[in-house]
Swiss-Prot record:
Protein name per its UniProtKB record: Ribulose bisphosphate carboxylase large chain
Gene Ontology MF annotations: magnesium ion binding; monooxygenase activity; ribulose-bisphosphate carboxylase activity
Propeptide: 1-2
PTM annotation (N-acetylproline): residues: 3
Source organism of this protein record: Quercus rubra (Northern red oak)
Source taxonomy: Eukaryota, Viridiplantae, Streptophyta, Embryophyta, Tracheophyta
Broadest EC class assigned to this enzyme: lyase
Something else known: The basic functional RuBisCO is composed of a large chain homodimer in a 'head-to-tail' conformation. In form I RuBisCO this homodimer is arranged in a barrel-like tetramer with the small subunits forming a tetrameric 'cap' on each end of the 'barrel'.
GO cellular component, as recorded: chloroplast
Residues annotated with N6-carboxylysine modification: 201
Positions marked as site (Transition state stabilizer): 334
Subcellular location: Plastid, Chloroplast
Amino acid sequence: MSPQTETKASVGFKAGVKDYKLTYHTPDYQTKDTDILAAFRVTPQPGVPPEEAGAAVAAESSTGTWTTVWTDGLTSLDRYKGRCYHIEPVAGEENQFIAYVAYPLDLFEEGSVTNMFTSIVGNVFGFKALRALRLEDLRIPTSYSKTFQGPPHGIQVERDKLNKYGRPLLGCTIKPKLGLSAKNYGRAVYECLRGGLDFTKDDENVNSQPFMRWRDRFVFCAEAIYKAQAETGEIKGHYLNATAGTCEEMIKRAVFARELGVPIVMHDYLTGGFTANTSLAHYCRDNGLLLHIHRAMHAVIDRQKNHGIHFRVLAKALRMSGGDHIHAGTVVGKLEGEREITLGFVDLLRDDYIEKDRSRGIYFTQDWVSLPGVLPVASGGIHVWHMPALTEIFGDDSVLQFGGGTLGHPWGNAPGAVANRVALEACVQARNEGRDLAREGNEIIREAAKWSPELAAACEVWKEIKFEFPAMDTL
């Protein structure tokens, strides 16, 4: 060992392992407006104090490692380290705590959701001192959110492009999701759009398979859109799924969609990845395409109550990365979604400023400044009897998407679309007249069905269909 090395190693450096809480648990810390704040649900291993567990999360997701290293002396840890500044027990849960961690903004690359998640959740979830760990919420400071483009267009620009105001938009996922030829697929799209829907949709796993290559699907769907527009006088769209095995192929598909003149493309943002999603969002902004986002794989990450990442965090990340629509559960359909939690992250998607509200799972006040909003999409196991509840829960700025609830109509796809459009228009009119959709919803649908045989047939088919299971993720 050289004398120079000995001198550096001996000044202020003591090798060995020390408790994380000595450095990273700082209960007196006053958070800054520029800090990224995180709320983690921490379940420590037996014998691990909550302060040590919270400090370990702060350390391992910022500057720390398992032992003291001499290169700590070459930088300012006080400037760059994450800090666990508050810990509170979770009411009604044994050995679970909410650990609040503050991260200095300089730890993160500007405009990169990928880098943000790599730091905050990239490594710490496998930490042995923790039995389980869940990221419940993030506070994104305005100084960081302003480094993101966000949604390609946002809610108001989309309404202006479509010339549709004062009601939710209606969609339909084409079924069967796999196996149709491109021509038959386009036929189903046309029938749904001419029946009164605003959009139809590729399912999340429709990419470019042997039974239907992407280019053929794009062409037949574009033909269906133009034919339906000519017949109805309304602007129509189909979410053409541009998700692909490489970013280059994804952009190539988006370019072809733009050349066809269609209004919207689609991406599976979790399986495709945030880097790919942000790239596609930038392309869509530059080329006038709307971007629909599917959240395929989300339940792998967010469904367990004590481990993973809550969807409200994934929703915030999507708003930063970019998307004009995102699937957000239904509350009333076949997929997971507790009402207050769902409404909490719906507000985080749409609104500019959202106050802290623990009753809805919102741990921090979030100010998005001028970042455009995202339309929540209600999809999964919904039908005409759900229309009053969906209209009341989600309001006008939403997309209500009926797959089986359109294509399962006994008279075919177009009558299924008519039934949904009539039900929606009836609910919107009743709401505008001051009627209570939650209390009078079934009566409103029955009244509309008297003059719409398509709606009457749909009401008869789905009158007994319910998906009543308790939500796994509750407050």
